[in-house]
Amino acid sequence: MGASQKNQELIGGLILFSAALLAIVVNNSPLASYYAMLETINVKLGIENLVIDKNLMHWINDGLMAIYFLYIGLEIKREIIVGTLSKPSNIITPAIAAFAGLAMPSLIYLSINHDIKVINGWAIPSATDIAFTLGILALLGTRVPAKLKLLVITIAIFDDIAAIAIIAIFYTKSLSLLSLSLGTLFILAMIICNRIFKINRSSVYVVLGFFAWFCTIKSGVHATLAGFTTALCIPFRENDKDSPANFMEDSLHPWIIYFILPVFAFANAGISFSGISFSILFEPITLGIILGLFVGKQLGIFSILAVFKKLKWFKLGESFSNLQLYGISLLCGIGFTMSLFIGVLAFNDTHLLNAIKIGVVVGSVLSGFFGYIVLRFIVTNPS
């Protein structure tokens, strides 16, 4: 990771945090009525009967986040072909750690939340916000070795893959087989353009990807799946920055960290404190998310990394201390944008959404703060 990219990650993390803070301030000020317009102003896209009519909040969550998952897909494809995921030996431990980091928070949440009305939120504390995490890693600089950062990124990649699967399987509320079939045809068209006709024009995949996204929204499956599958269909060539996948990933990166994620954070993090008491922190849903992110994530990930290191099943881990592994396990508890995103998909009740936002913010802040403290002040030998 070059110096300029490190600066981008740091600045992106700060902008993301500022956007979330601004949302909370605005939603608890005289400007709150304007903030509410995100859910009252509708925008239409389409012609005649082929129209998508959604409010601004939905456009952000279904449109901008589909672009974010397109970027994630491009990143994962590169890692599978030429990156850390191209070697099986580099995959096994981070994959199992990511799974444990998904399972443990979910189990903690479900152990606290037995009401059928809130069980659907089990996946909220299972996510990791890679943008925020990379921002803190950039802030730590050389205190975190490059290989340790690579381990965090690899775990986060598997976390993202799991999140995509969870959204597609568990948060699809209705299904139109006709629209889904049409979307699948556009995906197949991209595969044919790539594998058979060897078309390398990015614009072709952008147009076909847009129609795949449009059909996916109409089908009832969440649009993020269209973004991810589109990425897997785009041609990638090693050592060629002009290949469509490389070009699109490089082009999207600044838009993701400086615009898309901050806009999402601003739209979804606006906790309203009106009528809320301190006791909301101890409501089952809030407590389940806080403990899931802060306790479940670190417990699940660190236990796997430490045990595999002890058994010498984790070659890369031998160069790290247990404190370093514990520090990055804490950072993986920063759920923020991804946790908020799953929360919005799971519920639409205002009180529950407020409880979710508080749980996500508190759990993420605790994880980020203590992860930073461990890696910055307690780890004595970062090399």
Curated annotation (Swiss-Prot):
It is a multi-pass membrane protein. It catalyses: Na(+)(in) + 2 H(+)(out) = Na(+)(out) + 2 H(+)(in). It holds the Pfam family Na_H_antiport_1. It is found in: Cell inner membrane. The chain crosses the membrane at residues 10-30, 56-76, 91-111, 121-141, 150-170, 174-194, 206-226, 254-274, 275-295, 327-347, 355-375. One of its GO terms (molecular function) is sodium:proton antiporter activity. One of its GO terms (cellular component) is plasma membrane. Keywords: Antiport, Cell inner membrane, Cell membrane, Ion transport, Membrane, Sodium, Sodium transport, Transmembrane, Transmembrane helix, Transport. Belongs to the NhaA Na(+)/H(+) (TC 2.A.33) antiporter family. HAMAP family: NhaA. This is Na(+)/H(+) antiporter NhaA. The gene is nhaA.
